Amino acid sequence: MRHLFPALALVATLSFLCPADAQGQKGPSHRLLDKILAPSRALDPNAIYVPAPRWTFAVTGDLRQASFFQTQDFSLPSAKLSPSGELIIQETPVHLSANLRGKLGTAAGVQVGYGDLCFSLSKNLGGEDTEHVFSFDYQSAGYALQVQYFSYLNPVNYHQTFGEEGDWAYRDEDGMTEKPGQLRSFLVDAFYAFNRRTFAYSAAYRGNLFQKRSAGSWMFGSKVILGEYRIDPEEEVAHWVNGQARQTTAQVSLGGGYSYNLVPFHRQPYAERDKGLRNLIINLTFLPMVTFFNQFSSTAYNDLENGVYTRVDKDVRNGKLQVNYVARIGIGYTYNQFSVNLSASNNDYSYQGISSLTYGGFSSDAVETKGSFFRWTTTLRLGMRF
């Protein structure tokens, strides 16, 4: 878990910047941070309980699955003899599909936060695949911002058809890459709740705010995704598509929807450090979105000399508008300073484009590429506020 050390270093830095004085009182830097993270005065204290900002630590366990599917359609020249013995050159359709589908697996992680700020990292447990997730998020009553980096390694299964069934040169082949393919994504999610007075979006997920009574709010959301799929250029499947071993996408989406907090039970604390606090909450969030910026690029590599593969061409295209969505469900229970949270979320995107690349000194025919990525996660969080 190589990301653990940067995270611990960050926590240590925050601790250094927010020291207590000799009498155990908060220092100037700590008081400044508290002021920045102070809740809005617009919050209704009869609807939302806001405890004083404190350090939190949590361990997480994930049940998750990631999958990626890509198809590429193009044509290649092929030769055959006519009944009269004449050599005929014709265009033969080729269909290639690649599937990087991970098995249902588990992951473990840690979260460290202060007030509305939180840093987290997780890594999968066992299995042939390798997954790392690192995220930073800020969640308050009216705002939420999450920045997440995701990396996934797993062998790629592929299927190729050359020509049409019944043709003399028809081929139908399956295979798997010798080296794992890689998926990487950088995601930025931002949400705004219009009902910032009586609704706390983060109440079911973090335990930094507590909803006293049921409430909902219309939401505005935005999503930025930078995604990458790549395989080793030495793989045979890369040569089938003129050396295309890397595809990337950049997408920006905007949308709106509704989020609702159902509070079956709440009891206010009666002593310091939230002693006596009891809270049970369920959150449902759904936001349809429109992806208005959708850029796709494909990169070709060629073995120029001595087994060293070098980028020889790159093609960038802008895609069409498409519909996306954000869906999330969370359940949280708090007992004094301890909290248990169960949540489920999805992260998906799709792309398509037609690329024409120069490969091996020849200009390739147009390669139509379509890809889709889907990752769902169910997370159990056990946290404590200090």
Map each language-model feature to its residues.
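Outer-membrane beta-barrel transmembrane domain signature
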Residues: 72, 76-94, 228-337, 346-349
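Short loop/turn motifs that connect adjacent beta-strands in outer-membrane beta-barrel proteins
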Residues: 26-32, 36-54, 195-216, 264-282
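Extracellular loop and loop/strand-boundary signature of outer-membrane beta-barrel proteins
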Residues: 93-96, 131, 171-179, 206, ...
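Repeated loop/turn-to-beta-strand initiation elements of outer-membrane beta-barrel proteins
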Residues: 116-121, 142-147, 196-200, 266-268, ...
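Outer-membrane beta-barrel "beta-signal"
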Residues: 188-190, 372-386
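Outer-membrane pore/translocation modules
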Residues: 137-248, 345
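Transmembrane beta-strands of outer-membrane beta-barrel proteins
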Residues: 55-59, 119, 141-147, 188, ...
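Transmembrane beta-strand segments that form the barrel wall of outer-membrane beta-barrel proteins
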Residues: 114-134
